[in-house]
UniProtKB/Swiss-Prot annotation:
One annotated GO molecular function: glutathione synthase activity
Keyword Transmembrane: no
Catalytic reactions of this protein: gamma-L-glutamyl-L-cysteine + glycine + ATP = glutathione + ADP + phosphate + H(+)
Presence of the UniProt keyword Transport in the record: no
Name the UniProt record assigns to this protein: Glutathione synthetase
Co-factor note (free text): Binds 1 Mg(2+) or Mn(2+) ion per subunit.
Length: 314
């Protein structure tokens, strides 16, 4: 039976469809004859306890020069019988949080929201990994520049990054004796006012930062290793990393088995976990990517697997 699939995303005008996971989800929903509705960015509202949005009928095509057609926008109540894909990219700022609160009200009115709005509020993608310390490298999250500096000195090499970044932005590699360490810490913590994360530098990054996708807590059998290029230490695709599919190894599956049940319990139906070597570094719940690359390299239809789960009610 056709469903109404409502997508909350960044402007569709600016996406790169060859790599855009949200676009792959829309293609699959349309292939299944579901009705697509595009939410005008920033248009969620609350009126007398009901969530509304400006939405337009959407058609998509796998054509890099002409990939969508929008109908006329109109005010639509969000609720009963709808599938709402919350696919806005970080940062998870106040406006993002407010949108999830409005989506929680739509969920209470009968919508199925993916991922669960409460989980999106609760699970910062850097901090969430620390729910599973047995899987993680040595990590410190702090505003205290002195403590962060001592951590780098103890580990000898460390990665330093903000808690709200994505795509490799504002990530630093530093080491004991680095003359730039103080200014890096001043920048990341805004002079001690903002939390930042420090993790032991993992040499295995040269083999790739593995993105493992979970659907209802169960891993896809292949991951995408994002391999840094040249003298770059970041594997992120947005930072120029090269993506190479690989079958999951035993340690990957063990980490997924630690993380998956808790993600499912929290309603995080589509999740990306990042693994470097033997260690979990992040849990991506807002808008996990790498689906299109894995589909292309492995002959998969990951969006189809997700919609199979959605259509059964989960």
């Amino acid at each position: 039976m056709p469903l109404d699939v409502v997508v909350v995303m960044d402007p569709i005008t600016g996406i790169k469809i060859a790599k855009d996971t949200t676009f792959a989800l829309l293609l699959e929903a349309q292939r299944r004859s579901h009705r697509l509705h595009y939410v005008h960015p920033g248009s969620l509202s609350l009126n007398e306890g009901r969530t509304f949005a400006q939405t337009a009928p959407l058609q998509v095509r796998d054509n890099k020069t002409d990939w969508y057609t929008l109908g006329e926008f109109s005010e639509t109540q969000l609720g009963q019988g709808q599938i709402i894909l919350m696919r806005k990219d970080p940062p998870v700022n106040a406006e993002f949080i407010y949108d999830t609160q409005l989506l929680s009200i739509a969920q209470a009115a009968g919508a199925q929201v993916i991922n669960h709005p409460q989980g999106l509020r609760d699970l910062n993608e850097k901090i969430a990994a620390q729910l599973f310390p047995q899987c993680c490298p040595p990590t410190l999250i702090s505003r205290d520049m002195r403590a962060l500096k001592m951590f780098v000195q103890k580990q000898e090499q460390a990665i330093l990054k903000p808690l709200d970044g994505m795509g490799g932005h504002s990530i630093f590699r530093s080491s004991n004796g680095d003359p730039n360490l103080n200014v890096i810490l001043e920048t990341l913590t805004d002079g001690g006012r903002t939390l930042a994360i420090a993790q032991r530098y993992l040499q295995q990054i040269i083999e790739g930062d593995k993105r493992i996708l979970l659907i209802d807590g169960v891993p896809i059998d292949h991951c995408l290793a994002r391999i840094p290029q040249g003298d770059e230490f970041r594997g992120n695709m947005a930072a120029g990393g090269r993506g190479e599919s690989r079958p999951l190894n035993e340690r990957d599956r063990w980490i997924a088995a630690q993380v998956g049940p808790e993600m499912r319990r929290r309603g995080m139906r589509f999740v990306g976990i990042d693994v470097i070597g033997d260690y979990l570094t992040e849990i991506n719940v807002t808008s996990p990517t790498c689906l299109r690359e894995l589909d292309a390299q492995c002959g998969l239809n990951i969006a189809g697997q997700l919609f199979d789960a959605i259509e059964t009610g989960g």
